[in-house]
């Protein structure tokens, strides 16, 4: 009887304990929720003085106003910056997250020069499934250590080794374009993009994927689809939760694309690492290093051998993060810059003639590949590229997560705010670029750029987290453009308003870049 009574008491104690635990968990959840709401309310109140767009609602902010279509969304943001150009900054709420848009050189400088405000926006977390915590997405000590390790791999003497690859792929591109000479206008955007993809694959991984010959490869499709899905998800707060995202068809497609991308990169890394180990074994037993004697060096080879201050090498996962980052950042941005350059040159024949004359001066009638010395002499072409990136920056906006409260133009910007720098608007400030919509490469002549605010032009970002690969990008852009322009005369077939600007992760023309080609004949010019 006593045993039965004790059993009943024990059962009641268990039930009471479970109920108490549930009550405690529920109370903790409610308390946590109340704390979040209170924190949100404080932020809302404290940031009230910052100029803002009308019709922001609690919790959802301006999210309901945001256009879902990439083209309409970008146009909406640019219209806001034009409307509020007289204001030093502009506040937007994306769900419960406050954002301040910066398009004024003095205020952009505050964020980009700070050694404390180096954390990338929380929105970059949507890149992490693909890129991990590589140079683009990492923060704090990991970023500092990784940046220090990788900076030597972008030294110009190393970049020179990649010029042969750039020349070879540019010549393949020219052969592909030959069929369009004296034909109807065609969309050149994808041609250029595939060329840039071939270049970054071979320079980053030592792998020639032949994208220009096989544009339907599984890897190529996955690269483009992944970029589209990431941008779409960033704009839609209701897709931010991973478990919820996987309930949609796009979430499963994201997972499948991710598997394709990582499988490819992992296999290339393993293959390259095995080759390096085999060569080391050969050297160890006196057989030399013949297997890799004629193999071109790639960024991957440098990553496999680079060490930190303590002599530690990167892990396989670390290397994959950086290779995937090179792939993501290294082809779309460059391809966009080249496409926009072709559009602007085709729309401004007087500028194209000046480039023509410079090419004649440097190359004459020779069809030899460009050398490093040739590229250094193409100063006017470099000004064309700079002016192109002013009008159409490859990355039209990027963000930092404010890691501690700061002051911008007299306004208090709170920790946790997303500071969004908008180069597309920044580069159109008439104080620094009179007649900002006009294409004038001469703006970047040294005498004309003198005295311009150093943060009025940031196509590669600026400060501690500037683009580590900008020299590589400019080298590739000059190589491909000079190769195209030595063979063809470009005519654009679109007006500016017909381009349909789409500011995804990269600034693209939603309607493509349509041009006509004529064979260039130096004797007639």
Swiss-Prot record:
Tissue-by-tissue expression: Broadly expressed. Detected in heart, brain, placenta, lung, liver, skeletal muscle, kidney, pancreas, retina, retinal pigment epithelium (RPE) and lymphocytes.
Entry's transmembrane regions: 13-33
Cofactor annotation: heme
Activity regulation, per record: Inhibited by N-hydroxy-N'-(4-n-butyl-2-methylphenyl formamidine)(HET0016) with an IC(50) of 38 nM.
Keyword terms, alphabetized: Corneal dystrophy, Disease variant, Endoplasmic reticulum, Heme, Iron, Lipid metabolism, Membrane, Metal-binding, Monooxygenase, NADP, Oxidoreductase, Sensory transduction, Transmembrane, Transmembrane helix, Vision
UniProt subcellular location: Endoplasmic reticulum membrane
GO BP terms, alphabetized: fatty acid omega-oxidation; retinoid metabolic process; sterol metabolic process; visual perception
Protein name: Cytochrome P450 4V2
GO CC terms of this entry: endoplasmic reticulum membrane
Protein origin, superkingdom: Eukaryota
PANTHER family assigned to the protein according to its UniProt record, in alphabetical order: CYTOCHROME P450 4V2, CYTOCHROME P450 FAMILY 4
Disease cited in the entry: Bietti crystalline corneoretinal dystrophy: An autosomal recessive ocular disease characterized by retinal degeneration and marginal corneal dystrophy. Typical features include multiple glistening intraretinal crystals scattered over the fundus, a characteristic degeneration of the retina, and sclerosis of the choroidal vessels, ultimately resulting in progressive night blindness and constriction of the visual field. Most patients have similar crystals at the corneoscleral limbus. Patients develop decreased vision, nyctalopia, and paracentral scotomata between the 2nd and 4th decade of life.
Membrane topology label: Single-pass membrane protein
SUPFAM superfamilies in UniProt: Cytochrome P450 (SSF48264)
Reactions listed under catalytic activity: dodecanoate + reduced [NADPH--hemoprotein reductase] + O2 = 12-hydroxydodecanoate + oxidized [NADPH--hemoprotein reductase] + H2O + H(+); tetradecanoate + reduced [NADPH--hemoprotein reductase] + O2 = 14-hydroxytetradecanoate + oxidized [NADPH--hemoprotein reductase] + H2O + H(+); hexadecanoate + reduced [NADPH--hemoprotein reductase] + O2 = 16-hydroxyhexadecanoate + oxidized [NADPH--hemoprotein reductase] + H2O + H(+); (5Z,8Z,11Z,14Z,17Z)-eicosapentaenoate + reduced [NADPH--hemoprotein reductase] + O2 = 20-hydroxy-(5Z,8Z,11Z,14Z,17Z)-eicosapentaenoate + oxidized [NADPH--hemoprotein reductase] + H2O + H(+)
Role, per record: A cytochrome P450 monooxygenase involved in fatty acid metabolism in the eye. Catalyzes the omega-hydroxylation of polyunsaturated fatty acids (PUFAs) docosahexaenoate (DHA) and its precursor eicosapentaenoate (EPA), and may contribute to the homeostasis of these retinal PUFAs. Omega hydroxylates saturated fatty acids such as laurate, myristate and palmitate, the catalytic efficiency decreasing in the following order: myristate > laurate > palmitate (C14>C12>C16).
Origin species: Homo sapiens
Family statement: Belongs to the cytochrome P450 family.
Residues that hold heme according to the record: 329, 467
């Amino acid at each position: 009887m006593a045993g039965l009574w004790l059993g009943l008491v024990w059962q009641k104690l268990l039930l009471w304990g479970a109920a108490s635990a549930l009550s405690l968990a529920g109370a903790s959840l409610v308390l946590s929720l109340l704390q979040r709401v209170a924190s949100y309310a404080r932020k809302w109140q404290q940031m009230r003085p910052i100029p803002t767009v009308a019709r922001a609602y609690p919790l959802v902010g301006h999210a309901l106003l945001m256009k879902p279509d990439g083209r309409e969304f970008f146009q909406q943001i640019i219209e806001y910056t034009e409307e509020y150009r007289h204001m030093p900054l502009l506040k937007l709420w994306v769900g419960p997250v406050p954002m301040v848009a910066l398009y004024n050189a003095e205020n952009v400088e505050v964020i980009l020069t700070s050694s404390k405000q180096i954390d990338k926006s929380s929105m970059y977390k949507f890149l992490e499934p693909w890129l991990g915590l590589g140079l683009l997405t990492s923060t704090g000590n990991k970023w500092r250590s990784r940046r220090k390790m990788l900076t030597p791999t972008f030294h110009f003497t190393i970049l020179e080794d990649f010029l042969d690859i750039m020349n070879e792929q540019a010549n393949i591109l020219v052969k592909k374009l030959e069929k369009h000479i004296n034909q109807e206008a065609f969309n050149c955007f994808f041609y250029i993009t595939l060329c840039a993809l071939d270049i970054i694959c071979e320079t980053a991984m030592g792998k020639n994927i032949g994208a220009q010959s096989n544009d339907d490869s599984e890897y190529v499709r996955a690269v483009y689809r992944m970029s589209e899905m990431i941008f779409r998800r960033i704009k839609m707060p209701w897709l931010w939760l991973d478990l919820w995202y996987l309930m949609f068809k796009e979430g499963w497609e994201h997972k499948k694309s991710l598997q394709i991308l990582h499988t490819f990169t992992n296999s290339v890394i393993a293959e390259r690492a095995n080759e390096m180990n085999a060569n080391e074994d050969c050297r160890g037993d006196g057989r030399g290093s013949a297997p890799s004697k004629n193999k071109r060096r790639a960024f991957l080879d440098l990553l496999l051998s680079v060490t930190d201050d303590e002599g530690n090498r990167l892990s396989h996962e670390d290397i994959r993060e950086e290779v995937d980052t090179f792939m993501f950042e290294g082809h779309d941005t460059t391809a966009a810059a080249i496409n926009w350059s072709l559009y602007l040159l085709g729309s401004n024949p007087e500028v194209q003639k000046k480039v023509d004359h410079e090419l004649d001066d440097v190359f004459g009638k020779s069809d030899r590949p460009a050398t490093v010395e040739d590229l250094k002499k193409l100063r006017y072409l470099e000004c064309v590229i700079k002016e192109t990136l002013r009008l159409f920056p490859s990355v039209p906006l990027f963000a930092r997560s404010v890691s501690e409260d700061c002051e911008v133009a007299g306004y208090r910007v709170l920790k946790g705010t997303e500071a969004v720098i908008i180069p597309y608007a920044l580069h159109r400030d008439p104080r620094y670029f009179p007649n900002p919509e006009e294409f004038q490469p001469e703006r970047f002549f040294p005498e004309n750029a003198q005295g311009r605010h150093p943060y009025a032009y940031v196509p590669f970002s600026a400060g501690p987290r500037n683009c580590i690969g900008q020299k590589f990008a400019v080298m590739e852009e000059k190589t491909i453009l000079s190769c195209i322009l030595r063979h063809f005369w470009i005519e654009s077939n679109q007006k500016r308003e017909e381009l349909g600007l789409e500011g995804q992760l990269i600034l693209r023309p939603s309607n493509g870049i349509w041009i006509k080609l004529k064979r260039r004949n130096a004797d007639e010019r």
